[in-house]
């Protein structure tokens, strides 16, 4: 599922260095990294191995450099895992999805492999990242950069006219991306009537896959970006940028691939699935109260996936609810198996079996899943070193996810405190969305923030709350109920 993104934008009046303009937040983010012991520089032996393998990679012989792949990523990204090419095929479609072949550079048991198993995944803060692999690989030799020949696992998928896959193959090949786009580029091109069929077909296939997701009861979470800026007085402002439809279309290609990978693994009875249970009843109740607090109507019979699809991304209150919906997607984990099929195979939000195989530059488990699937397609045994690693991956990935989530939460807390620090003493209208032994959680709508409140005792109640603390260094926001409590 999607992660929260925080974008620190430049001061409109100064156009200076964002790191200088946002010094208070940068210091808070540095403190988060130190407190959580976020990995820093790579050890010398890892950098030495990375330098050595760049010119000695185990490259595939198959050549698909004439296929017009393109990449779609956030602006400025250099760790490009995925490139796609979509074509018409009869009444359906042919989707080729190239995934960076990290295994061509990473020797099993080597220094890079050992360090990657310690890190688990790339960790993102608003002002920087702690990468899974050294930049010589992750942002250069293994990255699917434009006009560069790179090794990749190519997923060659035939889809029918409804967008359902009818055949899937995976093979290693050399590829070349011809275009590097961001989501805004794609959206603008499609809206003005692009002549690039790859983009018009991405919209077509993406919309068909969204319809299939809706039919099977799935739920996607297109997280809006938190945008942090400074006003003329130097106060922090917090807003949400709505995701554009192109982000959904692009995500559907990744979901298509992950679902195909899971089916492949289950048929071969070896692999590792990304699984997730249905959200707990109490989590749903709390989210319903959050929706009511933001003025969003949620009929009792409507599933949460339907609600998320129905929200208006141009409405700030709806965006705030989407941003808060991450609570519905917790509890995901990894289920390895080798011989037989596990009892739990479903990812509740996908509403189907699912596997992570599309982000090997940024997530450890994907490297192993890709090798499993390519071995299955070649009708070859999965390598022993991969089989031996599968049972170890859930613990590694769980630890790295806990760290990633803690970092995300701490950075978000710092940003929200910064946005409110000049408003301490103000009174806000709020709704109590949960009650704890230490008080409760209240939702205010402008800015859309969920925070603790002293004296909140009735879930679902409306109240007037005073902001009593907004401390960036402590990453703390706190309210207290001052009156006007009415039950719902």
Predicted regions and their residues:
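Electropositive polyanion-binding surfaces
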Residues: 2-38, 45-461, 470-477, 486-487
């Amino acid at each position: 599922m999607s992660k929260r993104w925080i974008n620190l934008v430049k001061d409109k009046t100064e156009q200076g260095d964002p790191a200088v303009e946002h010094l208070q937040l940068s210091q808070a983010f540095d403190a988060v990294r130190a407190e959580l012991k976020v990995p820093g520089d790579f050890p010398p032996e890892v950098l030495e191995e990375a330098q050595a393998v760049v010119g000695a990679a185990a490259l595939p012989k198959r050549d698909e450099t004439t296929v017009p792949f393109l990449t779609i990523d956030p602006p400025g990204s250099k760790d490009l895992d995925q490139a796609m090419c979509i074509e018409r095929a009869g009444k359906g479609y042919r989707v080729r999805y190239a995934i960076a072949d990290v295994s061509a550079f990473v020797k099993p048991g080597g220094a890079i492999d050992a360090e990657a198993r310690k890190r688990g995944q790339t960790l993102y803060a608003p002002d920087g990242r702690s990468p899974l692999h050294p930049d010589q690989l992750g942002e250069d030799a293994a990255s699917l950069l434009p006009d560069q020949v790179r090794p990749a696992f190519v997923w060659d998928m035939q889809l029918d006219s409804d967008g359902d896959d009818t055949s899937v193959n995976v093979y290693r090949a050399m590829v070349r991306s011809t275009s590097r786009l961001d989501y805004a580029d794609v959206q603008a091109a499609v809206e003005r009537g692009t002549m690039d069929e790859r983009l018009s077909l991405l919209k077509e296939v993406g919309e068909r896959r969204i319809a299939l997701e809706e039919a099977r009861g799935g739920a996607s979470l297109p997280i809006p970006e938190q945008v942090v800026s400074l006003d003329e007085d130097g106060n922090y402002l917090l807003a949400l940028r709505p995701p554009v439809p192109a982000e959904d279309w692009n995500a559907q290609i990744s979901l298509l691939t992950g679902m195909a990978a899971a089916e492949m693994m289950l048929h071969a009875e070896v692999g590792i699935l990304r699984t997730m249970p249905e959200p707990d009843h109490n989590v749903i109740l709390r989210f319903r109260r959050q929706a009511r607090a933001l003025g969003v109507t949620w009929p009792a019979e409507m599933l949460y996936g339907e609600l998320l699809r129905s929200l208006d991304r141009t409405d700030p209150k709806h965006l705030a609810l989407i941003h808060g919906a991450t609570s519905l997607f917790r509890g995901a984990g990894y289920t390895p198996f080798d011989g037989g099929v596990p009892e739990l195979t479903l990812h509740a939000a996908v509403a189907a079996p699912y596997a992570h195989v599309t982000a090997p530059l940024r997530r450890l488990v994907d490297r192993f899943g890709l090798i499993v699937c390519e071995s299955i397609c070649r009708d070859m045994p999965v390598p022993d070193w991969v089989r031996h690693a599968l049972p170890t991956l859930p613990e590694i990935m769980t630890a790295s996810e806990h760290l990633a989530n803690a970092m995300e939460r701490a950075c978000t807390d710092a940003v929200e405190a910064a946005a409110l620090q000049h408003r301490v003493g103000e009174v806000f209208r709020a709704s109590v969305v949960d009650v704890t032994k230490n008080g409760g959680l209240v939702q205010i709508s402008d800015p859309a923030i969920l925070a603790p409140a002293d004296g909140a005792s009735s879930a679902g109640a409306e109240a007037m709350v005073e902001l009593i603390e907004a401390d960036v260094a402590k990453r703390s926001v706190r309210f207290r109920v001052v009156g006007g409590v009415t039950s719902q």
